[in-house]
Structure formats: structure tokens, C-alpha cells
């Protein structure tokens, strides 16, 4: 069962099993839910590589990466951008974590991170910037349905501590 947050965004409830996934990262490695079991996992959904808000959010996770790792968690970013875009984004900003290629946005849909958005009076469907923390058993431990890109990495680190 899903709950609704915000206008129409269906979110996975706390303590529910995370939806399964198996996606390639920027280097072609397959990352799956099964491969992440046994440790805490931060999954953040973002609209697009190398755009202002997405860059600030990624750099916030980068700047807090050592603390998040020391807290026993893995960070994973997810967008529909391709491998080349993800590699360049990670290289340009020295991102030390995997960026998954969600071609077709199925993972975003499964996690409730896809929905209606509007910009400049135009309504469209897209990735909604949101974050999940999964516990070592693959269950939802925390959800942020809306995030502040500049400080979200430190917010996640504070929660993990």
C-alpha cells in the first residue's frame, strides 16, 4: 500500500519492502536491490545531470560522502540520463558514488518519484526530487518527498547518525 504526499506523489510507506531493481551505473556495472542488502542505502532521485539544482544536490552528497560512508551507508543517485552523461557529471564534480541509469523511469515510478510537475506554466510528468533510505534488510526506513538541494546531504547524514 502506498501513501500520498504533497499533491499526488505516491510514496512508499515506512517499513515497507523496497521495490526490486537492477540498473546499470555510469560504468556499466549492474546495481540491484539484492546487491545492496546488508548495509544502509541512500537512494536519491534527481531530474537531470549537470543542471543547477541537481548539481548542488549531488555536490552536497559528495561533501558529506565520507560521513555517510562512516555511518555505514551507500549513496546512489538515480536519473534517466545515459551512461556518458552520468560519467561526465561524476567526473566534472568528483562524485564518489554510483549514478544509476533509469531509462524509461521505471524505478522512479516504482518508488513514487515520478509525477506531475510544472514549470513556466507548463505541466508535464517527470522525476520528482526525493530520497529514500533503505535499511540493511531492504525496507524503507526514511523518505524525503521534497528536498533542499544545497543541504540535503548533511540532512541525510544527520538522520543516519
Annotate each language-model stretch with its function.
Residues 2-161:
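Chalcogenol-based redox active-site neighborhoods
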Amino acid at each position: 500500500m502506498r501513501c500520498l504526499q504533497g499533491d499526488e506523489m505516491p510514496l512508499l510507506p515506512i517499513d515497507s519492502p523496497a521495490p526490486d531493481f537492477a540498473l546499470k551505473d555510469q560504468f556499466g556495472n549492474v546495481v540491484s536491490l539484492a546487491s545492496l542488502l546488508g548495509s544502509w542505502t541512500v537512494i536519491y532521485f534527481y531530474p537531470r545531470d549537470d543542471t543547477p539544482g541537481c548539481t548542488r544536490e549531488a555536490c552536497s552528497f559528495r561533501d558529506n560522502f565520507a560521513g555517510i560512508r562512516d555511518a555505514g551507508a551507500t549513496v546512489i543517485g538515480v536519473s534517466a540520463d545515459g551512461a556518458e552523461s552520468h560519467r561526465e557529471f561524476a567526473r566534472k564534480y568528483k562524485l564518489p558514488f554510483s549514478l544509476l541509469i533509469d531509462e524509461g523511469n521505471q524505478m522512479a515510478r516504482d518508488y513514487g518519484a515520478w509525477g506531475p510537475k510544472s514549470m513556466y506554466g507548463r505541466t508535464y510528468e517527470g522525476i520528482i526530487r526525493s530520497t529514500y533510505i533503505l535499511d540493511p534488510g531492504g525496507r524503507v526506513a526514511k523518505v524525503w518527498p521534497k528536498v533542499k538541494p544545497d543541504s540535503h546531504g548533511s540532512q541525510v547524514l544527520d538522520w543516519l547518525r
